[in-house]
Amino acid sequence: MELAKSFEPAAIEARRYPEWESRGYFDAGLDTSNPNAFCILLPPPNVTGTLHMGHGFNQTIMDALTRYHRMRGDNTLWQPGTDHAGIATQIVVERQLDAQGVSRHDLGREKFLEKVWEWKEYSGGTITRQMRRLGTSPDWKRERFTMDEGLSKTVTETFVRLYNEGLIYRGKRLVNWDPKLGTAVSDLEVVSEEEDGKLYHILYPFSDGPVGDLRGLTVATTRPETLLGDVAVMVHPEDERYAHLIGKTVALPLTGRHIPIIADDYVDREFGTGCVKVTPAHDFNDYAVGQRHQLDMIVVLKLDGSVPAVAERYTTDGQPREGVAMPAGVAGLDRVPARDKVVAELEALGLMLEIKAHKLQVPRGDRTNVVIEPMLTDQWFVAMSKPGADGKSITAKALEVVASGEIKFYPENWVNTYNQWLNNIQDWCISRQLWWGHRIPAWYDDEGRIYVAANEEAALHAWKADLEAEIARLQGEVQSRQSQGQTAEQYPDLAERLSVLHARYEEGTLRQEEDVLDTWYSSALWPFSTLDWTPEWPQKSNPALDLYLPSTVLVTGFDIIFFWVARMVMMTKHITGKIPFKHVYVHGLIRDAEGQKMSKSKGNVLDPIDLIDGIGIDELVQKRTFGLMNPKQAQSIEKKTRKEFPEGIPAFGTDALRFTFASLASPGRDIKFDLARCEGYRNFCNKLWNATRFVLMNCEGQDCGMDPHEPGTCVPGGYLDFSFADRWIVSRLQRTEAEVAAQFEAYRFDLVARAVYEFVWDEYCDWYLELAKVQIQTGTPEQQRATRRTLLRVLETVLRLAHPLIPFITEELWETVAPLAGRKDADSIMLARYPQADMGRIDEASEAQVAELKALIYACRNLRGEMNISPAQRLPLVAAGNAELLGRYAPYLAGLAKLSEVEIVAEIGADELAPVAVAGETRLMLKVEIDIAAERERLTKEIARLEGEVAKAEGKLGNASFVDRAPAAVVQQERDRLAGFKATLEQLRPQLAKLAGR
């Protein structure tokens, strides 16, 4: 097949990917006789989502690992799938309905869910189509969705089991509440940013009048409207100012209630007045204080964020008490107008002592931008710290498997984050007040009793069994009464109760829980639910589970170590007894070139598909300004975008983008994405393409030394006469193969990319191809044959080595190169064996010779530069040194240093006017006529310029302000410049001195 003149990625990508997929190259290996297994789980992206740079980055890493292990011959599974993304998906569909003037409540639950499933079918394939564009190779035949029948069954089975073990319970606790969505939300869905607010200083008068000079306690708060739910004022137990007041009460303004003054270590004595209001139903810290002090909880906001006429009141353990009437002027108001009303009334009473401007962290819903309210509601929870039947909590087990090294983090420092979160864990709220998601498998009877079961039939069965037991007990009591001679008129309540129970039994209905499970619950089961887990495993064999649980590595961002990683460890270990994965590779978050987070509101989002295909500036502006939460930002975003990308974004192709992602995968929290890197790696792909064209032009139709031959014939004059340059590139290849393998094992994909890049660009293309040209032009037939063989064999190996990072170009080139290189063992590079270093082929002598040759060539090039001689002008070289070595190097020197001839002499006279370069034991001089006056003038000017540069650099580096304040890299750059200027001066001054007397 003839290779195109230039690399055209779009055409290659469109052709190659369908070939790979249709031929089953991505299918999971299920060879149980092969003990080597590699499995990686795709963190399931939202089904309604689109590919963003973070997806592109971690999927490149996952695919590189998958291709690497597949080529090593391991059983390999990359498990793909998508997440139903409860809140995100429901919001999308509700917005669509809203545009039609319809609400989900107008449709009803069943009809609304039909609409969501329609949307899922329509939109769900977007992200997997985009993954294909990235060249990813998961086993698409095993693609899963978190609400598939099998996964949903696993969700139900685990919920029932945990409930029966006492590890799932229903309770009234404080949660993050989004009043607009009307549901509890996770911490990950809450964004806290600093905003301008106010700090209100309110006087709480003592119930029994002033105490000394004090009328009461002054409390500072940013939420005066929650004053209505206060149940105490707390001070620090060691605060001498208030020690004598502990145990007294204050009159709570506007309410007519009196609340105690309590002592608690939570109080910061240095902040404000040192007095803090306690509102357990509306603040997470206050909730904890309330639990410690057995304080009631008064809920002064309804779920929509408005103040009720009568606030619900609960004991510490969530039992209802008599409600608390709210002030008439405040009841019915939303929380913000309620705040204004409370402030006005406090001012009228003279109790508002001061209002100050104040910066505060305001929690807002990441999807609604509405202020999140800590809300006391009935929710379902997983008990994170409660010991199970084995005496250990699920959190303790999750900590143990990391502490023991059974699960390892890369980089290791993320263990601290994992431990910190788990050591400060709270029970996990797993219920959401949504319609889209896994409906909680719990049913209620008319008296509020809960029945958790796999299905309604099982719940009814349990309920009827309870009813039958109660009926039997009551009937036994009736019989006992009758045996004592009592008649029905004497136990009417008992008869009435029996009548009610019989009626209910005949009716036989239960009400299912309306809430659905938190999306993270089903995500926590992902490591085993996707492998078709059943409770019978491992007693009942399952090849996928047997081979791939635990999986090898999880690739994830640091932001979800707690929300996803830790929960997978807990749930998988508790349910299956196995860890979910052996390694956790934690990467940073992709940011723009300036280190800013990519976000719609900042207008700096990049779509990886746009980097692959390119996009015009007008279309890019339209994408960035469409659908903004704040349309006023459109103008500034457009201006910034047009300045940054005046011509739009060029097409880089998938391979260049993947190589860029891999090169950026260094340890750290932030990854700055610079488009210039993409351009550099596109150039790399072009260089690899052109190098292959060169090799093919010199090898196709030629004797490339691929015929069978005896090992002893690879000697001078034999069938293959390998030069020191041939042995050098093979030796360097072994070192590169070893480095790549080591860095893949260490999850240092940046170093994998660097090793491949430096070998291909710096050693194979820049040096070996040039050396090979000389050998093909000047060598014997045996040397030419050996050179062609080396060109092909090294190139073919390089293509396999680079394939996990840049799959498309390597497949395209390998198809042509492999047959010429004598490889006929695979139909695709994907199925070819990954290169493994043969350390016995490292040739240090040849490496030393090439290093010496390079030094000579650099010296010749430097001489040209010093004398301002055009690179195109061929000149003779005079060389003094080891005549045998120089004779061997002469053809290469002539070819690579653009010399007309190389004259080897015993020594170069001291009276020669031309500059002489020294490289090791060799002295080199270009034979050129010197215009003494002109050269003297040139050297004088150049020395003066360099002395000026030295003075400037020394002045900068002598300035303490520059050295202390400039970035370290800038200071080092200045030091390097100074060293370079001085080194050049050391070369030029002797040359000028030589000319001085002429």
UniProtKB/Swiss-Prot annotation:
Catalyzes the attachment of valine to tRNA(Val). As ValRS can inadvertently accommodate and process structurally similar amino acids such as threonine, to avoid such errors, it has a 'posttransfer' editing activity that hydrolyzes mischarged Thr-tRNA(Val) in a tRNA-dependent manner. It comes from the Bacteria. Its EC number is 6.1.1.9. Disulfide bonds: none annotated. One of its GO terms (molecular function) is ATP binding. Residues 455-486, 929-989 form a coiled coil. HAMAP family: Val_tRNA_synth_type1 (MF_02004). Keywords: Aminoacyl-tRNA synthetase, ATP-binding, Coiled coil, Cytoplasm, Ligase, Nucleotide-binding, Protein biosynthesis. This is Valine--tRNA ligase. The lineage of its organism: Bacteria, Pseudomonadati, Pseudomonadota, Betaproteobacteria, Rhodocyclales. GO terms for biological process: valyl-tRNA aminoacylation. The keyword Nucleotide-binding applies. A motif ('HIGH' region) lies at residues 45-55. Its main location: cytoplasm. ValRS has two distinct active sites: one for aminoacylation and one for editing. The misactivated threonine is translocated from the active site to the editing site. Belongs to the class-I aminoacyl-tRNA synthetase family. ValS type 1 subfamily. ATP binds at residue 600. One of its GO terms (cellular component) is cytosol. It comes from Azoarcus sp. (strain BH72). A motif ('KMSKS' region) lies at residues 597-601.
